[in-house]
UniProtKB/Swiss-Prot annotation:
<dbReference type="InterPro" id="IPR002019">
    <property type="entry name" value="Urease_beta-like"/>
</dbReference>
<dbReference type="GO" id="GO:0009039">
    <property type="term" value="F:urease activity"/>
</dbReference>
<protein>
    <recommendedName>
        <fullName>Urease subunit beta</fullName>
        <ecNumber>3.5.1.5</ecNumber>
    </recommendedName>
</protein>
<dbReference type="GO" id="GO:0035550">
    <property type="term" value="C:urease complex"/>
</dbReference>
<keyword id="KW-0963">Cytoplasm</keyword>
<comment type="subunit">
    <text>Heterotrimer of UreA (gamma), UreB (beta) and UreC (alpha) subunits. Three heterotrimers associate to form the active enzyme.</text>
</comment>
<dbReference type="GO" id="GO:0043419">
    <property type="term" value="P:urea catabolic process"/>
</dbReference>
<dbReference type="Pfam" id="PF00699">
    <property type="entry name" value="Urease_beta"/>
</dbReference>
<comment type="similarity">
    <text>Belongs to the urease beta subunit family.</text>
</comment>
<keyword id="KW-0378">Hydrolase</keyword>
<dbReference type="InterPro" id="IPR036461">
    <property type="entry name" value="Urease_betasu_sf"/>
</dbReference>
<comment type="pathway">
    <text>Nitrogen metabolism; urea degradation; CO(2) and NH(3) from urea (urease route): step 1/1.</text>
</comment>
<dbReference type="InterPro" id="IPR050069">
    <property type="entry name" value="Urease_subunit"/>
</dbReference>
Length: 118
């Protein structure tokens, strides 16, 4: 064995993430002048306002990528991403404090409206 090597039992098949959870695909554009990086568990509804997309549709969703990973949006870049719904109690605290409690029941504070993304 080589130091740091991982040996995986191929008979077990592929590991599937977020099986059975609601997902959505979304087009996102960075209208800002700096790169923006979003981590795997960041509440997508509350990301940097320079990212333009259907923000209301992302309430209660995060990136559908492995834990600890991130996606970087370069200035002027548009990319298609996949989001996955938060599970468990669906309580969201922190970030920009737009949701402070259960995402299904909470009334959000004001986040600047996005320009229509073309």
């Amino acid at each position: 064995m080589i130091p740091g090597e991982l040996r995986v039992n191929d008979d077990l098949g592929q590991i599937e993430l977020n099986v059975g959870r609601t997902t959505q695909t979304l087009s996102v554009a960075n209208y800002g002048d700096r790169p923006i990086q979003v981590g795997s568990h960041y509440h997508f509804y509350e990301v940097n306002e320079a990212l333009h997309f259907d923000r209301e549709a992302t309430k209660g969703f995060r990136l559908n990528i492995p834990a600890g990973m991130a996606i970087r949006f370069e200035p002027g870049q548009r990319r298609t991403i996949e989001l996955v719904e938060f599970a468990g109690k669906r309580e969201i605290y922190g970030f920009q404090a737009a949701i402070m409690g259960n995402v299904d029941k909470h009334i959000t504070t004001t986040i600047p409206d996005d320009k229509e993304v073309k």
